Amino acid sequence: MATRYIPLSLKHTATPQVENFALLAGLEAAVRGVLVSAMPLAVYEVLGDAQSTSAAYFMAGVVALGWGLMVPWATRLIPRRWAYTSGCGLYLLGMALAITGTTWSVSLALICNAMATATTFVCFNAYILDYVDRANLGRSQSVQMVYAATPWSVGPMLGVWLHHLWAPAPFLLAGIFALAYYS
């Protein structure tokens, strides 16, 4: 066999399977599920009123929209794996900023988390289109939903509960999930 004499470092890595992408979808759901409830509480606490909180979310949304539209262009200049890694890094930066708890840091954390979500979403879906054949796309989405169901069900409740125990706790947990998502 021809591959018998090829050193291990030269062998091609295995193609990712549907379950591998579903695991990534579950980890992303864990990060976002905890943040979807804890982040509004943190923003409201530091800004003090609903109007300022709404303005902060509007600005984060505008920035994330522009950023998300630029991700495909950016992946032409840098490899997609580095764009994906930068998205995970933005999640970690957002968690670190949210833990500090100042007005500016929590507002910047909101923007970083929105940019991270846009980046990882675009890169993740591009990877799925690259590695999952057309016949398995329906199965891929179904398996992703199964892996993401529990984090999306438990995460918001867990985020609020942890926030009431200790304000930085949901961000630490989301940071741990973001590190696992990066790995």
Show where each model-derived region lies.
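Residue-level signature of mid-helix packing/kink "hotspots" within the transmembrane helices
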Residues: 61-69, 152-153
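Intracellular juxtamembrane helix-capping segments at the cytosolic ends
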Residues: 39, 119-132
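Helix-to-loop junctions at the C-terminal end of transmembrane segments
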Residues: 67-79, 163
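Helix-loop junctions at membrane interfaces in 12-TM secondary transporters
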Residues: 99-110
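Structural signature of the two symmetry-related core transmembrane helices
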Residues: 82-96
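Helix-loop boundary and gating motifs at the non-cytosolic
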Residues: 6-61
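Symmetry-related core transmembrane helices of the 12-TM Major Facilitator Superfamily/SLC fold
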Residues: 170-183
